[in-house]
């Protein structure tokens, strides 16, 4: 049986917020997953992979402050936050939502 290859749909620069740390890297949407890959020079950053079927909610928010343009990814019992460019935030969230709907 041949496994379906994941296709990259969209990739944007992002910072993964972990308490007081902001780990720089990239958010990548594929046909099956949402991935965060930190830059190689980041200390303490780790790669994250979320199966699209496991994502309970994804949303864009705007709060006041230096980490204002955020994408929130919610899974069962876990909440992940990423800071992205304001111009890319809504478009990326919409693309993830479309891909989640296609994977149901």
Kindly give the residue locations of the regions a language model identified.
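Phosphoinositide-dependent membrane-docking surfaces
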Residues: 34, 49-63
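Canonical pleckstrin homology
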Residues: 61-86
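Generic secondary-structure boundary signal with a strong preference for alpha-helix termini
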Residues: 36-37, 89
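Anionic N-terminal interaction surfaces
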Residues: 1-29, 44-48, 65, 78-81, ...
């Amino acid at each position: 049986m041949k496994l379906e290859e994941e296709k990259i749909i969209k990739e944007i620069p992002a910072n993964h917020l972990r308490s007081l740390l902001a780990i720089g890297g990239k958010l990548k949407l594929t046909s099956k997953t949402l991935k965060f890959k930190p830059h190689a020079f980041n200390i303490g950053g780790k790669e994250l992979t979320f199966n699209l079927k496991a994502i309970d909610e994804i949303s864009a928010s705007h709060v006041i402050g230096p980490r204002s343009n955020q994408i929130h990814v919610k899974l069962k019992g876990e909440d992940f936050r990423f800071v992205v460019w304001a111009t890319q935030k809504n478009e990326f969230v919409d693309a993830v939502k479309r891909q989640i709907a296609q994977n149901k």
